[in-house]
Amino acid sequence: LAVLAGLQPSGVICEIMADDGTMARGEELELFSKKHNLKIIAISELINYLSKKRSLVKKIETINLPTKSGIFELHLYEGIFDNQTHLALTKGDFLSSDSVMVRVHSECLTGDIFHSLRCDCGNQLDTAIDMINNNNSGIIVYLRQEGRGIGLKHKIKAYKLQEKGLDTVQANKELGFEPDLRDYGIGAQILKDLGVSKLTVLTNNPKKLVALEGHGLEITSRIPIIIEPNEENKNYLNTKKVKLGHILDS
């Protein structure tokens, strides 16, 4: 906030306490700000402003990347504020397409690297890469937001809770997290940096479409990624369908 205001990057922080001694939140903070004539802003508002007015990522390097599916270019991006790295895998002359085939994929170490059968993430990534290679054009945006945004440590803890009978949503809540904490603002900015504005999105998650549109991208169509369930992930996939709204076409 200080930098955005054109000031030195420094400040003072203090917690505002409620009458019962707990930290004030939401409506209590709104009332406090009005009473004392203070400015107030939500973190979500700041993120929304930054995503629309300023670039949150910068491209670091681009290399050729031969893969088992075909030849791609790999673009390395870095977050301006957190230095987190993200990737974009591009194929062909995608800018000549009226609508670019795109997969925005969130990191899943266990699925993408170790081919875990507990989820469908690795299969979705492999299928999307093959689809884009066969299309001779498209983009995979690979976002470093493991475990639907809760991080690898908490994801493994959530897995342990699932072994005790909780589903993936219940496990997140038991650990104190929302079911899905992923943010697609960085992904949208990577796509914009690559010159893309109209997308044909490879996804089973309609909320992802809403998120990308919310960051100024036009979704022309959705193509499902059809993955055959197995004994290990069938309950997980059903939870994604019932509780998270995923469209699991068969």
Task: Mark where each language-model region is.
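Catalytic domains of riboflavin
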Residues: 1-250
